Amino acid sequence: MADTVEKVPTVVESSSSSTVEASNSAEKTEPTTEKKKWGDVEDDDDEEEAVSELNSLSIKEEEKPDSILEEPEDSNIKAVTSGDTPYTSASRFEDLNLSPELMKGLYVEMKFEKPSKIQAISLPMIMTPPHKHLIAQAHNGSGKTTCFVLGMLSRVDPTLREPQALCICPTRELANQNMEVLQKMGKFTGITAELAVPDSTRGAPAATRGAPVSAHVVIGTPGTLKKWMAFKRLGLNHLKILVFDEADHMLATDGFRDDSLKIMKDIGRVNPNFQVLLFSATFNETVKDFVARTVKDPNQLFVKREDLALDSVKQYKVVCPKEQNKIEVIKDQIMELGDIGQTIIFVKTKASAQKVHKALAEMGYDVTSVHGNLTESDRDKIVKEFKECLTQVLIATDVIARGFDQQRVNLVVNYNLPTKYETGEPDYEVYLHRVGRAGRFGRKGAVFNLLLDDGWDKEVMEKIEKYFEANVKEIKSWNSEEEYKSALKEAGLLDE
């Protein structure tokens, strides 16, 4: 579809400002009824102001990247357009009529060479008038964040000191990460951004009644954003574009549906012509049907369920006689034998996190853990250290399963399979997001699922395989060094 139709050009405002500003506005969290869940998803905030000098806007040849990573080949993206607006797939960023400032950000700061497949198809849909809504699903690591960040930046008028783009995320970590991407990509534009998440400092004064926000882009979590709107801190009159990152979770009944719908309705009362972008790696049928009823006449991009798992990531399952054997598999087999970059180990409980942490730390690995006993500022510090490669292993509940982007991660271990708290049934969306933490942007990677030989873990794994129509290879003997060597070689984590 997208390769054969004609594109209507968009005019993008360029900026005369010589700086880009980004500030984090924080808010004290109020007591709420604790939600029963295995993970501890909430939010994140590490106050950092990035002010960059605008140098020459010309892009020097030596500053362009020499090569591009192989992205997942989303060859089975199904595109359904609404209306008669023609679109042309963008094979180059030059095809998008972007400002010189944004082009420099893409090439010099982001080190991009060309759009990934999801970017090539979705960006013309986002930027072409009449700016129709978009529901977009694509592989983890395929470049979805760039789609909506570039979409927001391209539609902002830097001369108007009012909020014009809003991005809503389910966690603090994801909001921070999206802010970092926006700061890099928009470094030369003069576009300002503000972070709306709960304060990481316990007892800090609430920021709900502060001065009205004048930043062009606001990125935050739904609870804080809803309060800002209620206290008139966040003006909606000039809002052009609303983004839901991890939209399946934002609009699920057990997620943030009520808050998300209220925000959409409040914006619609003031500015009915705003554009809605919904991005996620997963959309179950219930959420997909709900979105179709809620968002009017959207363009849609979807990937078949069986095509969602990344081919570059090899998945394995290991049946262990006892819990202690899982730790032995991690430290004596996988970590000891493989050529491992960085590793994320997903656990169900804080007790498991502490147990695995202790075992690996005693082996001399640089290990950190993220779980519910930590303050937000401690979580921020740990995630930041991992992203800066100061630590090798991160043990976590599902707080970072969604959207966490660290390209050096090539190993994911499911110490516990993801299941739903209420029913114990497999959480398919969380499994897919976990797998997506390895092999970012087509890099090689491996996922090891550690199962107890009690029947239940095996049943959960079988349901996951059936759901994704995938056969996960089994390591027949949990303590066979040769089998692990063979698996690691196959995954590209051990030289021949």
Curated annotation (Swiss-Prot):
Keywords: Acetylation, ATP-binding, Cytoplasm, Helicase, Hydrolase, mRNA transport, Nucleotide-binding, Nucleus, RNA-binding, Transport
Chief subcellular location: cytoplasm
Comp. bias regions, Low complexity: 7-25
MF (Gene Ontology): ATP binding; ATP hydrolysis activity; ATP-dependent activity, acting on RNA; mRNA binding; RNA helicase activity
UniProt keyword annotation of Coiled coil present: no
Biased composition (Polar residues): 78-91
Induction: By abscisic acid (ABA).
GO cellular component: cytoplasm; cytosol; nuclear envelope
Superkingdom as given in the UniProt entry: Eukaryota
Tissue expression profile of the protein: Constitutively expressed.
Family from the record: Belongs to the DEAD box helicase family. DDX19/DBP5 subfamily.
Protein name: DEAD-box ATP-dependent RNA helicase 38
Domain (Helicase C-terminal) ranges: 329-483
Domain Helicase ATP-binding: 125-301
Region feature Disordered, mapped onto this chain: 1-91
GO terms under biological process: poly(A)+ mRNA export from nucleus; response to abscisic acid; response to cold; response to heat
